From Swiss-Prot:
Keyword DNA-binding: no
InterPro entries membership: Neuronatin
Disulphides: none
Gene: NNAT
Taxonomic source organism: Bos taurus
Superkingdom, taxonomy of origin: Eukaryota
Protein name per Swiss-Prot or TrEMBL: Neuronatin
Amino acid sequence: MAAVAAASAELLIIGWYIFRVLLQVFLECCIYWVGFAFRNPPGTQPIARSEVFRYSLQKLAYTVSRTGRHVLGERRQRAPN
């Protein structure tokens, strides 16, 4: 029962990171449509799409590897910044 709960929690975390990636991509792709409500404040630079992907994929890879280590019973490590 505990294994099922742990697996469900890890899937929820992985789903959250996938949602964040999709949200960032949506905002980066669609933010400059004419009439779109969300825009960057004047004088600021948008985050590069490659930077968003790299950060999100690093976090996702860390979460997946942490899940594997948890299942195998290995020690924890800190998340990448």
